[in-house]
Design a protein with these regions (language model features):
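A basic/glycine-biased coupling hinge at the interface between accessory DNA-binding modules
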Residues: 2-8, 25-28, 33-36, 47-214, ...
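Conserved RecA-like helicase ATPase core segment
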Residues: 2-12, 44, 48, 161, ...
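Pre-Walker A adenine-sensing motif
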Residues: 11-22
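Helicase P-loop NTPase motor core
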Residues: 30, 34-42, 104, 270-273, ...
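Motif I (Walker A/P-loop) of helicase-class P-loop NTPases
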Residues: 39-48, 73-74, 227-228, 331
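Conserved SAM-binding loop
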Residues: 42, 62, 89, 243-244, ...
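ATPase/helicase motor core of nucleic-acid motors
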Residues: 95, 268-269, 311-315, 341-445
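SF2 helicase catalytic motif II
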Residues: 208-227, 242-243
Length: 445
């Protein structure tokens, strides 16, 4: 790009950001440290590809891990180039659902299939094995989801990696049989089933690759094995593939994230260009130095050194305390000192690792006369009334959705007991009927 002819939307980018946006090779790994402007880079790159008339918006696929991030990515790209509204910018799971509904016949599914979340999966386990406790059902649902993250089927020889429980293979197999018989899928299927279909069906694979000539992935360090396999099938030899991530921020191993996906990216995808974003616009240097002093001991990392653009800043303090009560008292002391020095309560945020830890603060803070507000205790879609309404809608769209049917069949109360409910489900299953029609026929008889 000739100096002096830079478009307005590229102004303000630092040299590394500009290089990442304008790079035209087929394989690009952007190592973006915290606070280095990666969201601006990836959204500007989407708009830049369209503005330069290299690609149609419809040929661009951008995936990330949360709806909030996907919405922000879309809005910021559209602010630069409105036609980016036509690009496919979604979460991995949302893209998987989009892909499966458009290829439903290839999956032997109806396009109106229901998608089971973690609670639904646990309920399905319980419907198959009613003697299991609620906790056991949740544990098995979690293990099944984990198996799918690692692309392991019930007959996989490596399933012991997930669980050595002698009954797990049978439970997983029964769960899959029931899920398929009802024509529904769970969250893990939204990644695994498209990946497996694209691997075996050359026609659909080629058609999909022709559709999506550009693939961008945000927060790549959080990707799991199934998502990696899906990405391998989506990106053809001539596709432009750009992933953005930070191997130093890979903290979701317990959810199945595989840091090797980003560490091995240059080995798996030949001729990869690596661009490092190391200018931090968020934190002071003291915080960056503290973080670096810890993460530098990781043996397997691609490496980068963050430099703060903000001057000054206080050094972080680390306190070693004996128990949670002492931690809470320490936080209370710091908070009261801040207010005593003419600060405000609203200036203070306290982060804790698990929701259960909030109980200690709720118990002790009133004793210290400290006002507080807990943020994000219950997610909108986890509220009972919201899940009930979604279940009613799911039944309208897919009358074979057993889990949604069981959730709302007695809301409001209709006097349908467990025995009657089992009879409806069994009658539907053995006669190839949906649950609404099965109910009608049983009532008529």
């Amino acid at each position: 790009m000739i100096l002096g002819q830079i478009p307005e939307y590229l102004e303000g980018l630092n040299p590394e950001q500009l290089e990442a946006v304008c790079y035209e090779g087929n394989r690009l790994l952007i190592l973006a440290g915290a606070g280095t402007g990666k969201t601006r880079v990836i959204t500007t790159k989407i708009a830049h590809l369209v503005k330069q008339s290299r690609f149609l918006p419809e040929s661009i696929l951008a995936v990330t891990f949360t709806n909030k991030a996907a919405n922000e990515m879309r809005e910021r790209a559209m602010a630069i180039e409105p036609s980016c509204e036509r690009a496919i910018i979604r979460t991995f799971h949302s893209f998987g659902a989009w892909f499966m509904r458009r290829n439903a016949n290839a999956f032997d599914l109806r396009s109106e299939f229901s998608i089971y979340d973690e609670d639904d999966s646990a309920e399905l386990v319980h419907s198959i094995f009613p003697a299991f406790t609620k906790r056991d059902c949740g544990d098995y649902a979690f293990l099944i989801a984990k198996a799918k993250d690692y692309c392991l089927s019930p007959d996989s020889p490596n399933l012991d990696f997930i669980s050595r429980h002698p009954e797990f293979r049978r439970i997983y197999s029964a769960y899959e049989d029931r899920l398929r018989s009802t024509g529904n899928v769970d969250f893990g299927d939204l990644i695994l089933m498209p990946a497996l279909l694209l691997e075996k069906d050359e026609t659909i694979r080629n058609r999909t690759r022709q559709r999506f000539r550009v693939i961008l992935v945000d927060e790549y360090q959080d990707s799991n094995i199934a998502q990696f396999r899906l990405l391998q099938q989506l990106a053809g030899p001539d596709s432009m593939l750009c992933v953005v991530g930070d191997d130093d921020q890979s903290i979701y191993r317990f959810r199945g994230a595989e840091v090797k996906n980003i560490l091995n990216f240059p080995k798996v995808f030949a001729d990869t260009r690596i661009i490092r974003l190391e200018r931090n616009y968020r934190s002071h240097q003291a915080i960056l130095d503290l973080a670096h002093s810890i993460v530098v001991h990781n043996e397997n990392r691609l490496g980068k050194n963050l430099l703060a653009t903000r001057p000054g800043g206080n050094k972080p303090k680390i306190a070693f305390l004996d128990d949670q009560d002492q931690e809470i008292e320490f936080c209370a002391h710091i908070a009261r000192q801040h207010v005593k020095n003419e600060g405000a309560w609203k200036d203070i945020a306290i982060l804790y690792r698990t929701n259960a830890q909030s109980l200690g603060f709720e118990r002790l803070f009133p004793q210290f006369d400290i006002p507080y507000r807990i943020v994000g205790a219950v997610r909108f879609y986890e509220r009972e009334e919201i899940k009930d309404m979604l279940a009613f809608l799911a039944i309208l769209a897919n009358p074979r959705d057993e889990i949604s049917f069981k959730r709302v069949v007695n809301k409001p109360s209709r006097g349908i007991g467990a025995s009657s409910l089992d009879k409806i489900i069994s009658f539907a299953f053995h006669n190839g009927l949906d649950l609404i029609e099965a109910s009608r026929q049983l009532i008529a008889s």
